């Protein structure tokens, strides 16, 4: 459950470490984003000599949330951190590696590149 001003970890090797949500995409009054939703973020903390710079405004997809996500079979899944993967303007991941597990809901939302790069899909 990510909303405006939420801080997220970055789960790829794009060079950004922390990002802040500045908009939840998908509706004019949409308040929350969950796993698989696209948000607009501002880079708050980045490594030197990286692909993205501090202050850059980018799109990102949420891959992990602390708030549990219900599934069709009645089970729930939640993670220890709120994390996102940065996306280019074409919708492709900026980084070439994904760190940590990602949720299976990304496969249903057609983020196949992220699912294939992830070390574990839960």
From Swiss-Prot:
One of its GO terms (cellular component) is cytosolic large ribosomal subunit. Pfam families: Ribosomal_L14. GO terms for molecular function: large ribosomal subunit rRNA binding; structural constituent of ribosome. InterPro entries: Ribosomal_uL14, Ribosomal_uL14_bac-type, Ribosomal_uL14_CS, Ribosomal_uL14_sf. Keywords: Ribonucleoprotein, Ribosomal protein, RNA-binding, rRNA-binding. Coiled coil: none annotated. GO terms for biological process: translation. Part of the 50S ribosomal subunit. Forms a cluster with proteins L3 and L19. In the 70S ribosome, L14 and L19 interact and together make contacts with the 16S rRNA in bridges B5 and B8. PANTHER family: 50S/60S RIBOSOMAL PROTEIN L14/L23 (PTHR11761), LARGE RIBOSOMAL SUBUNIT PROTEIN UL14M (PTHR11761:SF3). Binds to 23S rRNA. Forms part of two intersubunit bridges in the 70S ribosome. Belongs to the universal ribosomal protein uL14 family. This is Large ribosomal subunit protein uL14. The gene is rplN.
